[in-house]
Amino acid sequence: MTAHLLPPGIEVFERGWLSANNIFHYGKDDVSLVDSGYCAHQKMTLDLVSGAIKKHGLSALNKLVNTHLHSDHCGGNAALAEVFHCEVYIPAAEEAAVKNWDSALLSYDNLGQECPQFSHHHVLVPGEEIVLGRYLWKVLAAPGHDPHSIMLYQADHRILISADALWEEGFGVIFPELWGEAGFEEVAQTLDLIETLPINLVIPGHGAPFSDVAKSLATARSRLDYLASDPDRNARHGAKVLLKYRLLEWRSREIQQVNDWIANT
């Protein structure tokens, strides 16, 4: 339904919930990928990228861009960089944590998730622009789900890569609130920013691309009001999401191992 809304040179690899969507951009002078999925699925990510490069008669992957550094969005970074020797772009606010590979600052300890260590080459600064494939994209700050998250906006075709700031039926867990930091107001401000943009298509971090932005914003705001009215709801929701995510990765575990993971996360 949305394929015709994508201009030439953009392909969406819709994944699932364990791995974020990957957006493949290709043009004469640049081939880029936005987000790399979770490490447990890195072979699939490599196969998808290799297949797209072959299908379109390309020879390289030049850039790997991360909207944020939750492990479902950057878990394939190390593998992609090793195979394709691409340059890695991360949100500017995460630079020190990546340079020093601080798994606590990168939230992997708190979230009980894994991410193979990787290096970066460049940073993404809100307000600046970056060429991905054939088109110029503007970097937009999108705090809330993650304080350092960014979105990417293509003005000519009115496309927003929203990551986990907006899905068709909501948004990602507001993690900062779980460790006593602000998040609800930041989500509201990010939704307000999205509303100011002329948008024909949103490519979310999870789920299919969608075009009814007004409906999705209304759904997201309703969800935000529900969570913000009782912060314990957000905490319970976050805990359930983290457990479901881990179970998706494990598939099968002894109950004691699950209980141990819960106790240590």
Name these PLM-found stretches.
Residues 2-56, 151-163, 168:
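Conserved beta-strand hairpin/beta-sheet module of binuclear metal-dependent hydrolase folds
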Residues 31, 38-40, 136-143, 147-228:
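Metallo-beta-lactamase
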Residues 40-44, 49-131:
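Active-site HxH/HxHxD metal-binding segment of metal-dependent hydrolases
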Residues 11, 65, 89, 122-124, ...:
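Hydrophobic/aromatic beta-strand patches that form the interior of the parallel beta-sheet core
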Residues 9, 25, 35, 68, ...:
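Divalent metal-coordination and catalytic microenvironments
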Residues 4-10, 108-112, 133-135:
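Short Pro/Gly-enriched beta-strand edge/turn motifs at strand-loop
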Residues 195-201, 208-265:
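Accessory terminal helices/loops
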